């Protein structure tokens, strides 16, 4: 699985330009889960991450390369108890998985399953608002959660715990960034991940290898492994017929 490897390398190169704090990973101390999405009124909120005119983004990358030995939570910028006002925000997840094999349909299914995890994490007092079209993500933090000691280590552990429930996931790296220059620099990679997602959907909805007339040809040409996945799926369809 090489689809996201170039983006992962570029992301980490950008992240490492900043002061990166490696937070402890203690799944037993993950933040309590609300069980479902909650709505926080403005009057009950301490502040927002990525709110107002502040930039925000999220994206998830998958790799079978051995890039970490254990789960990781990385932070660029202040931790939640240190924040007093609205700040920029990015949350990036990198998943190291088992070998997903050569079956393109199985690879696609596994990627989609892992992507959907982010819609099922509900830290109490941590209200997430997504925009899948623009890759934006804003978070509203409740005064009560802040009073009880919510932190990125606890929230990151909640995400890791949920991702580890997905089949094939070996290790999870969750990166939180709260510096405007860092968030802005990563926006192009969020766009590239979105392009890959749209291209995968297009491939599996239109299993034809007529690359010359495909709107997604640019992405297939640029992303290592995408064209092989598409052609492999087309051959599999031909064999069935």
Where are these regions (language model features)?
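Short, flexible helical or helix-coil boundary motifs
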Residues: 15-18, 167-170, 193
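Short Fe-S-cluster ligation motifs
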Residues: 179-181, 237-241
